[in-house]
Every structure is written in structure tokens, then in C-alpha cells.
Amino acid sequence: MAELLGTHSYQLDPKGRVSLPSRFREAFADGAVLTLGQDGCLFCFPRAEWEERSREVRSLPLSDAEGRAYARMFFGKAEAVELDSQGRLLIPQRLRNEVGIRKEAIVLGVFDRMEIWDKDAHERYELTHGGAYQAGTLEPGTR
């Protein structure tokens, strides 16, 4: 699978569709799964990556309350989606409502998944959390 990289800004159309960067489209040619992500965004996984992540989540013990809660959110908020012929992805209204995506969306490549943010929420996130990246405290090899 091609790496999903970069930050792209798009307007949602009146139906709630967002265009994907042309270099992302091949990764989602076999379909995608949208689900609620952490930090106020949506995660969008290519179908093959979703299958791998699903196996990991399904392996969480049913006896663990946090594991059950995580699985409920991960699967319960998920929606299988397809790209249309113009490379657009329809974001279901209920998911747009969950993360506050209205008119402008940020499409962020995060290596093996895509994140979709409301533009204003993404700007707030970067202002609040950009310091951790600048400090390099989680950079590989620094722990």
C-alpha cells in the first residue's frame, strides 16, 4: 500500500462529499471504512488496513470493560464507504455531526490511514498539541 502523507484542505459539497488527493485514491480503490477517531477526527482506513485493525480490536478480551468500550466505539461508529467516479468520499451525516465537520475539511495522511478533520478543529489541535512534536519527546530513539 502507498503511504498516505500530507495535509490537504477541501470544501465539502452540498451532499457531504469530500474529494481525496489523487495520490490517495489508489489506496482506497477497494473501498474504505470510516470510523470515529481520537482527538475529534474521523479515521478512514483502506479496506485491507481495516481488516488488520479489526483483527487487533477483536482480540481485546471481552472480560475487560475498557476493551469492550473501545470495540463498541470502533465498530459501532464505523461505516463502509466507496469512492465515487470523481474520487469523492461521502461522509455520512451522523459522522460529520460527531466531529463537527461542516463545510471545510482537512484530509490528513497518517501513513496507513487518512484522518478527516473539521478545519477549525484541526487548527485548534495543532495549536494545542504542536509542542509535543517540536519538543521531540516521542521521536523514535528518544525514550
PLM regions and their residue ranges:
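Flexible "stalk/tail and boundary" regions
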Residues: 1-10, 14-15, 24-81, 85-86, ...
